[in-house]
């Protein structure tokens, strides 16, 4: 079907991180923002390694966004890091359309439960066709902030789904 996604950034969870969806989003004028998790095999491992090396070498220090979180009985913050998609192995760049011009995104959440004081750390990774740089130069801070907002928006939808499943057993419904 036809959708006008011109300029939109479309997010999907790891289950839907498939080339066919990325192609369909791009065909309709949008950009994909797709979760990369362990169920996607080596893509996840390779992205994780790229960020690990870049952070260790302080290559992405200036390409970071940090946001405070306060609510739902938790306090903490998110850090979002962005690397150019072209850093991925060519086997992925041949497979994923527009990723060579796009971004790799890492988000780290540090959350502390206010009642218990227990702190958790979660890491999430994404691939996106959204351009890393408008002119081939360094990334703009506004792009990093936009990627951080995409992560926040993505997890807002994910947490809403979690509540629906918890209360209404939504994942148990079988549609035919």
Features from the language model and the residues they span:
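Short, surface-exposed basic-aromatic patches at helix termini and helix-loop junctions that form
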Residues: 22-30, 49-52
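An anionic, glycine-rich sequence signature occurring as long contiguous blocks
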Residues: 37-152
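Short glycine-/acidic-enriched loop or helix-start segments at secondary-structure transitions
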Residues: 20-22, 44
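Glycine-centered flexibility motif
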Residues: 7, 30, 70-78, 165
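Short amphipathic alpha-helical "interface-anchor" segments enriched in bulky aromatics
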Residues: 131, 141-174
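Mobile genetic element proteins and their domesticated derivatives, centered on retroelements
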Residues: 10-13, 32, 126, 158
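Short acidic/polar capping segments at secondary-structure boundaries
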Residues: 15-17, 31, 37-41
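Conserved, well-structured functional cores that handle cations and Mg-NTP chemistry
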Residues: 1-20, 28
